[in-house]
């Protein structure tokens, strides 16, 4: 292609999961894209747990795939174990989770980026974003990003910039008394950019995360541990894949004990978190083992999962034993666990805190409100998790591409936005920019009020055609979706026209109350297994199980789904009422000082967003609504 450094449309800063999806999206939409990262060989690393997916997280991975992203395909290519979580519960909270070969995963990410047209990789550290409307003191008031500056002094121009710095922006690693400016153990932090952003007027904070030690498989006795049952059939994340044929690796369940806890209690004073050296807030739902022991003193044990890091490595990941205690204490602590009495640690557990950009300074398109053309995604926005990062990354990449294109064509910029009823990604971004964060944000099904519509099996139905319309998704994906929808209609027709017979009832006693009813009507009975109905008809049994289950769920929960649709229609009216970008809230008499301050800080885009803000009363919403209607 041969375009020079001055020719880029989009620059992505950082090569983690957010950066990879952002760069791929922008490049695939035809924009000349540069991904700058400190170490090209570290692109796409699974820095912590060797797994992808989980409750609500698996939904996000499938949404990324439906949008034309790659995380689902990477996961399929590296899968070594598959489990559908919450199978005994309702379909709204079921989600796929896989163990991944972490080294193969990173190779796939790097190779895909290298092979993508319109995309270049460059190894350097970005220390500043050059903006218009910058004062002599470096402050920016509603300027526009048009270049980045690197540590080696290169100035590279761009029409849009996406920041995906992960834990590296001003990162510091802690292990007992050891402390170093690193974003990941052994990898130096990115200095300069955080200070540059503060100078421009951005409000920054610090958050913390951590990771457990890794041990050698040959040094532990897995035979005394409980093998974790996995699903017999590996199912793909990507809608482009039909089946997965890969080697399987086992995970194991273990527990801490009173000896473990006593050792930890005796060494609380050596933890940098308890001594006050780490002041940043950590992830509530993934606490360190010392935090668990301190908060739950009556617990006699805490569950651990022993997980393989890949097929071509002997390293095991001890899920549940995150720590920042000194290495000598980690050695002793791990050896109190059954089967690990002679464990050899290859990499110690550690904590890392890092700089974040408070996300209320972003619009719903993940563009900063202070600097147009500057987007951010992933842990810099206060989230935790590979999946949350990837979900933000693809949206930031799409919108950076659309913004860059608009500056070339001089046409109006129309951002790509996912609403709360369209995707978990939409829920997450709305939460971040509307409510902000005071701790690392993790996605849960409970955060989504329309989760019956946001099931993992419907991600393609919700998002694929939207992605195709903006030039990101392939036509083959749309054709696959259309085939699936035709199949669903065929299944529905068969369920509506076939009835439960006496023969069926004699074979299955639970069908007796439903003799003469259609299969569809029978499915509304929650005690009737979906698979039972499929087995009653040879034609139905030949259809893909996942597609049949999707139809069955929609029939069984149609009244709940209809109620959600009504609620969505009501909310849409509020979302349709826009608030001008520089609206003067001081003009509204009757608005409390607290509410006015919050509104001026967040600068919501719509009345619907105002209603979801923290500390905003219904009366405030009505006052604002009345003023806008004048």
Curated annotation (Swiss-Prot):
It comes from the Bacteria. NAD-binding protein involved in the addition of a carboxymethylaminomethyl (cmnm) group at the wobble position (U34) of certain tRNAs, forming tRNA-cmnm(5)s(2)U34. This is tRNA uridine 5-carboxymethylaminomethyl modification enzyme MnmG. It comes from Treponema pallidum (strain Nichols). The keyword Nucleotidyltransferase does not apply. GO terms for molecular function: flavin adenine dinucleotide binding. FAD binds at residues 14-19. NAD(+) binds at residues 282-296. Its cofactor is FAD. The lineage of its organism: Bacteria, Pseudomonadati, Spirochaetota, Spirochaetia, Spirochaetales. Disulfide bonds: none annotated. PROSITE patterns: GIDA_1, GIDA_2. InterPro entries: FAD/NAD-bd_sf, GIDA_C_N, MnmG, MnmG-rel, MnmG-rel_CS, MnmG_C, MnmG_C_subdom, MnmG_C_subdom_sf. Signal peptide: none annotated. Belongs to the MnmG family. GO terms for biological process: tRNA methylation; tRNA wobble uridine modification. One of its GO terms (cellular component) is cytosol. The gene is mnmG. It is found in: Cytoplasm.
